UniProtKB/Swiss-Prot annotation:
<keyword id="KW-0458">Lysosome</keyword>
<dbReference type="GO" id="GO:0016020">
    <property type="term" value="C:membrane"/>
</dbReference>
<feature type="zinc finger region" description="RING-type; atypical">
    <location>
        <begin position="184"/>
        <end position="225"/>
    </location>
</feature>
<dbReference type="GO" id="GO:0034145">
    <property type="term" value="P:positive regulation of toll-like receptor 4 signaling pathway"/>
</dbReference>
<keyword id="KW-0968">Cytoplasmic vesicle</keyword>
<comment type="function">
    <text>E3 ubiquitin-protein ligase that plays a role in different processes including cell differentiation, receptor recycling or regulation of inflammation. Mediates the ubiquitination of AKT1 and GLUL, thereby playing a role in neuron cells differentiation. Plays a role in the establishment and maintenance of neuronal transmission and plasticity. Regulates Schwann cells differentiation by mediating ubiquitination of GLUL.</text>
</comment>
<keyword id="KW-0863">Zinc-finger</keyword>
<keyword id="KW-0833">Ubl conjugation pathway</keyword>
<keyword id="KW-0472">Membrane</keyword>
<dbReference type="GO" id="GO:0004842">
    <property type="term" value="F:ubiquitin-protein transferase activity"/>
</dbReference>
<comment type="pathway">
    <text>Protein modification; protein ubiquitination.</text>
</comment>
<dbReference type="Pfam" id="PF13639">
    <property type="entry name" value="zf-RING_2"/>
</dbReference>
<keyword id="KW-0967">Endosome</keyword>
<dbReference type="GO" id="GO:0005829">
    <property type="term" value="C:cytosol"/>
</dbReference>
<dbReference type="InterPro" id="IPR013083">
    <property type="entry name" value="Znf_RING/FYVE/PHD"/>
</dbReference>
<feature type="modified residue" description="Phosphoserine">
    <location>
        <position position="52"/>
    </location>
</feature>
<dbReference type="GO" id="GO:0007010">
    <property type="term" value="P:cytoskeleton organization"/>
</dbReference>
Amino acid sequence: MGGKQSTAARSRGPFPGVSTDDSAVPPPGGAPHFGHYRTGGGAMGLRSRSVSSVAGMGMDPSTAGGVPFSLYTPASRGTGDSERAPGGGGSTSDSTYAHGNGYQETGGGHHRDGMLYLGSRASLADALPLHIAPRWFSSHSGFKCPICSKSVASDEMEMHFIMCLSKPRLSYNDDVLTKDAGECVICLEELLQGDTIARLPCLCIYHKSCIDSWFEVNRSCPEHPAD
């Protein structure tokens, strides 16, 4: 009490609430250091931690390890509670926090021991994989209806679904083939004489069992989906 503080001890860091002392003065040739802040309550229970993890907020990125943003949760590390982070004075052997290694250059994040650093190109667009936005989300290309297989513009999508789902199923007439009639396009087997067929209003014919299965998930002719 009453003692005269040194000039270095009275120097203030760039952050409010940061108290500095002689230990906050960076050693010759050492990395920049912002001092310490106190997290405890009483005089005997005060603990100081390094706040150099906020490098990039008031510090030249070239000296802060190039980290544009950081989210830091203090965690105790051995004697002295010293922390190693980009821009801090940590050991050079910990390459995780060294320049260029504390975050993913491709825009991802790196999380370790409560620390999260976002890369210089981190953005929502970079984080999302391309397959999450299919081509049919575009208002120009529209999408293909899974019911009738028609291409529909995105602004007409809701109305089309309502009409497509409420459209009555096609009716057909049963018949028995009197002669061979080529291939059934559903099962790709031949329509032979004596087979029971279904004749649709468009005059297309199929095996009755095939068209019944088709109409369980579709409401139009396999060869005339627009009808």
